[in-house]
């Protein structure tokens, strides 16, 4: 392989440490390793040029090397300013080479990026020499949004100026687009024409995709990986159940037993949060807007309350809604002195971080990286993790390898599906076919030593399915 010269990571000398962790993770990621074996000769992604934007973790490193093992070329950035594991990023750049002669994949990611640096990195995954990228692998929808809004502003001939209430992140995003428009005035239009499809990892990004489709501005097919059963019911719930506690422990060493905890949101992620705290002996209450989810919480044994009535005596508050404006500045003023506030939704707008970071009468004291104390005019203070961003990735290393194996196997299969079937999908949002979802589950059942019951032909006919599956209709709720 040729020497990699186009990259930006923290420190290539970390590559050996990263490689050891990647090697161990491979044993815990049977889905990806099985796909490597199954498709080694076929090379179904040969010719794919993937612009990837997912947290640059050890588990993502195994995904990247699976994509390249199946024939793809890849450029990568993280989808969060705090989530990169620098040793994993270094190992992927070095590849089979050395720190002095790196021969891996171009990566643009390091832990602790500024917002301007973050959007610079996103731009880099689309800046290929020669041919343009033809696939996007996204988490949160930022890479996809860059192409869609970039093309829109190219057509208008101008990038709009930020408005007074725009977030710092959106201001940085517009700044990146403005610079690109000045240097390459047709870049995003050419990219939109080149991309065959996007596969999206998370709930927030899927919401964006459906919004773009409704607007009529989605320029290529999109695969909703998040709502694959082997993603949402495993990564979102069981992964969160593990990594939330890991993040809080690494950040604070706080004992959770006996504490009053408020979990905002009771979707798959919120369910994982509530179970995690319950398992630690905490007293858990839940907020929820959807009556079905609220009823589930009640039946699972949790009180369902509003933020206003519960925040004053909560020791820990966690947002997990995927929505915005969940915890306001005024509500933070009511919190217990030294209460803990964190978020495990994709973006930082669930908590009013803008007020915390920009008010002159709020004093910020950094305890350690991604752990800050904010002191209010009333003398009370709260501890905020990862500046309101994903605490499980900012304060820890995210979900464990095995559960990410299911998600990333889904991503790999979705990339193959869209890349190999160009023209068969319209510019809409699709779910991963059920038979492929079941394939991913089957691999992991076997890896855990489970033995599946095989239906007889008569049994399969009786319930109207094929002996080999799929076993459930699309509308089935697991």
Curated annotation (Swiss-Prot):
Coiled coil: none
One Gene Ontology MF term: adenosylhomocysteinase activity
Bound cofactor: record note: Binds 1 NAD(+) per subunit.
InterPro entries, per database record: Adenosylhomocyst_ase-like_sf (IPR042172), Adenosylhomocysteinase-like (IPR000043), Ado_hCys_hydrolase_NAD-bd (IPR015878), NAD(P)-bd_dom_sf (IPR036291), S-Ado-L-homoCys_hydrolase_CS (IPR020082)
EC number: 3.13.2.1
Enzymatic class: hydrolase
Keyword flag NAD: yes
Positions of NAD(+) binding: 202-204, 236, 265-270, 288, 323, 344-346, 392
SMART domains registered for this protein in UniProt: AdoHcyase, AdoHcyase_NAD
GO cellular component: cytosol
Catalysed reactions, as listed in the record: S-adenosyl-L-homocysteine + H2O = L-homocysteine + adenosine
Function: May play a key role in the regulation of the intracellular concentration of adenosylhomocysteine.
Record family assignment: Belongs to the adenosylhomocysteinase family.
Name of this protein: Adenosylhomocysteinase
Gene name tied to this protein: ahcY
